[in-house]
Amino acid sequence: MTATPFSPPLYMQRYQFVIDYVKTYRPRKVIDFGCAECCLLKKLKFHRNGIQLLVGVDINSVVLLKRMHSLAPLVSDYLQPSDGPLTIELYQGSVMEREPCTKGFDLVTCVELIEHLELEEVERFSEVVFGYMAPGAVIVTTPNAEFNPLLPGLRGFRNYDHKFEWTRAEFQTWAHRVCREHGYSVQFTGVGEAAGHWRDVGFCTQIAVFQRNFDGVNRSMSNAEHLEPSVYRLLYRVVYPSLCDNNIYQKTLINEVLYEAQHLRQQWLIRENMNNNAHFYSPPLMEALHHGAEGNACEQQPVYQQGGIICVPLARVWSCPRVQALCGSLQRLREKLLEDERVRMSADGSALNLPADDDDDNVEEEEEEEEEENQQNVKAVSGAVNNMEEDWDRELGSYGDE
């Protein structure tokens, strides 16, 4: 018996195989059966590559409820919403059950799942996944029994809950029968390769990748199937922020525009301050400053001041790559900004109007008003507490009278 350490660990290699498949084929709807602690789902939400619906199914609701919040959006998902939508759902259910919501998926993954079924249940598994669900592709991974003698200290199956472990021939026999009965083609591969002359035993984990043969049949749910009762129990559902949501898109666009405009405003203020106090700065620094300003003026419209307003040309803001990616055209950008009350623009819509001075006085007034309001709230709460104490004393006195 030979020691066979795997680096990275075998489970990570299995997940990476699925991630690589998703990167290559970009399925929009993915469902993972036997998702347990949601490890694969967590990885796929970071490597979504076009995934719009990510679903996990497991019979163990306790584990799902414990792990489901690890799939929630991060702060960064709100600060930088993705271009495409993403919904994640977790269900308590069995791969042996015909559930209407599992139809119409592009990819089904069954990572180290099938060996936990009884042998007589495998046919039902095949019928539900390949016959009823009929996804575009299915990835099935399972232990290779021929590799077991190379695993140190192993007696019997690799896990106490495994009902069987197939040799390569047994796995391939099952897979080819599935293809004949349900119209799929299959390719075999694996992860966890033995070293040296032991390679003839195959991979430690064997993998079958099924692709449905195109037959022109629409596999989406029919109207009758929409009426079928659901047998799964929805435990968790979250919709990630994305630019497909008009409100999120508008907020993101305005934030980017204002950030860029404030940046240009600040640059202009610094430059003006240095011009007004040129005797404090070295000639090389001033020369560099004027050279940069002239270059910008030649290439783009300059920022300018009108009274107490600094005008930042919209064309300057439009030159920001992030703004261009969000808006597509300068005209569309102008239209979006004119719709938003947070943005002040020139009469002809050619520039954003920003205050020349930081409005410190208004900030102080707002802080004073907030402090006064807080003090009033404290007084109100104190009065309520005093009244409660009086009522409590009165109530105690009434009990004493009895």
Swiss-Prot record:
Location relative to the cell: Cytoplasm
Annotated positions binding Mg(2+): 112, 115-116, 162
Binding site for S-adenosyl-L-methionine: 58, 94
Residues covered by region (Disordered): 348-402
Cofactor: binding details: Binds 1 Mg(2+) ion per subunit.
Biased composition, class Acidic residues, residue ranges: 356-374
An annotated Gene Ontology molecular function: O-methyltransferase activity
Gene Ontology cellular-component annotations: cytoplasm; nucleus; P granule
The protein's name in its UniProt record: Small RNA 2'-O-methyltransferase
Record organism: Danio rerio
Taxon lineage: Eukaryota, Metazoa, Chordata, Craniata, Vertebrata
Gene: henmt1
